[in-house]
A protein has these predicted regions:
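Short, charged phosphate-coordinating catalytic segments
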Residues: 2-8, 57-80
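Proline-centered turn/helix-capping motifs that create local helix->coil transitions or kinks
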Residues: 2-10, 115-122
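Flexible interdomain linker/hinge and immediately adjacent N-terminus
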Residues: 3-41, 134-136
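Conserved tyrosine-mediated DNA breakage-rejoining catalytic core shared by Y-recombinases
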Residues: 14-15, 70-113
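Active-site/catalytic core of tyrosine-dependent DNA strand-transfer enzymes
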Residues: 34, 104-163
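Conserved catalytic core of the tyrosine transesterase superfamily
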Residues: 41-55
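Short, contiguous acidic/charged loop-to-helix segments that flank catalytic cores in large enzymes
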Residues: 42-44, 86-102, 136-145, 163-170
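C-terminal catalytic core of tyrosine-transesterase DNA break-rejoin enzymes
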Residues: 55, 59, 63-67, 172-184
């Protein structure tokens, strides 16, 4: 076995570079803050749409916005949404289990309000992506849509006395925190 890097120049080890630990604090809203955001009166339609997508993520067990964007009509039944996370679709794992999310009244209303009229099983539920886009175009569209939600959500939150740090990830963490508190 030939050594590729001379130990003298190896960057890791005692008194050398250490990979930093995670400092990512999971941020979430408590029930009072969720109520304020849910009942907030948007000043612009963009704020309403941003809030609605945020709460759709929340009521769908904290579904990632990337997964919402990729939902197809085949993923939705009368009772639930069944999907495989975009994050895990391309992994080599053999036992990837689909996620099942019960459809709440809010989720049904939201899908009726924002869903594509074209409800073929192969069509996207929401008019954000379309089949004719390249992977690069889809990636840009997803990033722009998430930025759009975050930008308008921050405005709505600020106008209602909530933190401007809010983002789409807060829906995931707020759902998880709420679920843990309810089961405690």
């Amino acid at each position: 076995d030939a050594k590729v890097i001379d130990p003298e120049f190896y960057p890791f080890g005692v008194k050398k570079y250490e990979i930093p630990g995670s400092t990512n604090v999971k941020k979430s809203f408590d029930s009072d803050q969720l109520s304020i955001l849910f009942n907030a009166k948007p000043k612009k339609p963009e704020q309403e749409k941003a809030r609605d997508f945020w709460f759709f993520s929340f009521v769908c067990n904290g579904m990632n916005v990337k997964d919402i964007i990729h939902l197809k009509w085949k993923d939705i039944t009368d009772e639930q949404i069944v999907f495989i996370r975009e994050k895990t679709k391309s992994t080599k794992k053999a036992n990837i289990k689909p996620i099942q999310v019960p459809l709440s009244d809010f989720a049904v209303m939201f899908i009726k309000k924002y869903g594509n009229k074209d409800q073929r099983k192969s069509s996207f539920v929401f008019p954000i992506l379309d089949e004719s886009m390249t992977e690069e175009e889809r990636h840009k569209r997803k990033q722009n849509f998430i930025r759009y939600i975050n930008q308008h959500l921050k405005q709505l939150a600020k106008a209602n006395g909530l933190t401007e740090d809010i983002s789409t990830y807060w829906a995931r963490h707020s759902f998880a925190t709420t679920a843990v508190r309810k089961s405690a």
